[in-house]
Amino acid sequence: MAKKIIGYIKLQIPAGKANPSPPVGPALGQRQLNIMEFCKAFNAATQKMEPGLPVPVVITAYADKSFTFVLKTTPASVLIKKLAGLSKGSAQPHVDKVGKLTRSQVEEIAKIKMEDLTAADMDAAIRTIAGSARSMGVEVEGV
């Protein structure tokens, strides 16, 4: 028989830097999950990723105080800002343009994000990422 699920916890944690301090500790503590066990497993799973990039994670908590977790890909906005060399997006995205991306840079982001997007093919994924970039005030050339 399957384990009884008592809840899901969604967090964004920097790759390789999970520790018991907030937000990880309180979120797992409320469900009485082993915080250090999660931190060690998360850091081991993200050690090949670029340190410090935020990684969304969905933790499934079970009634027997065990857990499983699924790593998602880094948010598109973070990847767009990184490739465009920005610290933040535009306050008025359709008025003030703060950076530029080429089609090849957008393709690179789309390849990374493809598994988490609902796009049917690569071209649709590229258009999705280009739309996210435009909504941040970043111009996209060739899309």
Curated annotation (Swiss-Prot):
Role played: Forms part of the ribosomal stalk which helps the ribosome interact with GTP-bound translation factors.
PTM section of the record: One or more lysine residues are methylated.
Native source species: Nitrosomonas eutropha (strain DSM 101675 / C91 / Nm57)
Annotated keywords: Methylation, Ribonucleoprotein, Ribosomal protein, RNA-binding, rRNA-binding
CDD domains for this protein: Ribosomal_L11
Gene Ontology terms describing biological process: translation
PANTHER family the record matches: 60S RIBOSOMAL PROTEIN L12, LARGE RIBOSOMAL SUBUNIT PROTEIN UL11M
Gene Ontology molecular function, alphabetical: large ribosomal subunit rRNA binding; structural constituent of ribosome
Protein name: Large ribosomal subunit protein uL11
Pfam family, one: Ribosomal_L11_N
GO cellular component, one term: cytosolic large ribosomal subunit
Gene: rplK
Gene3D superfamilies, A to Z: Ribosomal protein L11, C-terminal domain, Ribosomal protein L11/L12, N-terminal domain
InterPro entries given in the database record: Ribosomal_uL11, Ribosomal_uL11_bac-typ, Ribosomal_uL11_C, Ribosomal_uL11_C_sf, Ribosomal_uL11_CS, Ribosomal_uL11_N, Ribosomal_uL11_N_sf
Disulphide bonds in the chain: none
